Amino acid sequence: MINRMNPSVKFVMITVSMIAMAFFFNPWTPLVFFMGVVLIQLLFATVSWKTWSLMMLPFLLGAVGYFWTTLVFGNEDSTLGTALSLSFRVLAFSSLSLLFVFTTKPVEFILSLMQQLKLSPKIAYSILVGYQFLPVLKDEFFQIRQAQQLRGVEVPKSPVKRVTAMRHLLIPMLAGAVRKAERTAFAMEARGFTGEGDRDFYRKITIGRADAAGSLLILVLLCGSMAAGWLL
């Protein structure tokens, strides 16, 4: 169900939830919210749990770091509660963000922003073109590096020298990216693209029952988390 939600509706609901969670400083509200997001992801979403665990690991380490530093260097009056609140808040926000990332297709998200939230087509198509260029830039990076190795350019062993040597790779990549962007702009203008907001779409992103059910589910979780913070 979460995978079938309109990306704009999902984005608005997640943004509202994050803003609302920012006003609660007790540890129970973010903890209940985090557990609820994981439960929603388990029952109503299709994600790769292995990838989710790997992506969640840095946030988990960050939450542990927040807990430790606040516990050691915080005010003695409310050290434990503040430490738990900060660490659980990191987990709640990160799990909600990953839920959006793993259940939303980037192209559908941009199309939905244009159709539902009236994002400027100039900005939207610029983002789409940049997104499509990412695999091309990756291939060009390896091609340029292999070409330099064939010409006898050695890869430095020192991490600092390796970073400074990246400029020999980045300059050709940036030059190629500028040429591709210019050709893409000329091609879009030749096909009649003007950037006007009033336009027809071949692929329409609609709002349906899954959006109502998913929004209601997120609102119930948000209200339940707030109630848990008040009662516990």
Indicate residue ranges for each PLM-predicted region:
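Alpha-helical transmembrane segments and their membrane-interface exit regions
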Residues: G36-T46, L61-F67
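Membrane-helix interfacial "entry" motifs
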Residues: I2-N3, L43-T51, G74-T82, R203, ...
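Transmembrane alpha-helix interface motif
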Residues: M1-P27, F33-I40, Q143-L232
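Short, aromatic-rich membrane-interface segments at the entry and exit
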Residues: N26-F34, K50-M55, T79-L80
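Membrane-helix interface segments
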Residues: P27-W28, V47-W49, K118-I123
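Juxtamembrane/interface alpha-helical elements of multi-pass membrane proteins
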Residues: M55-V160
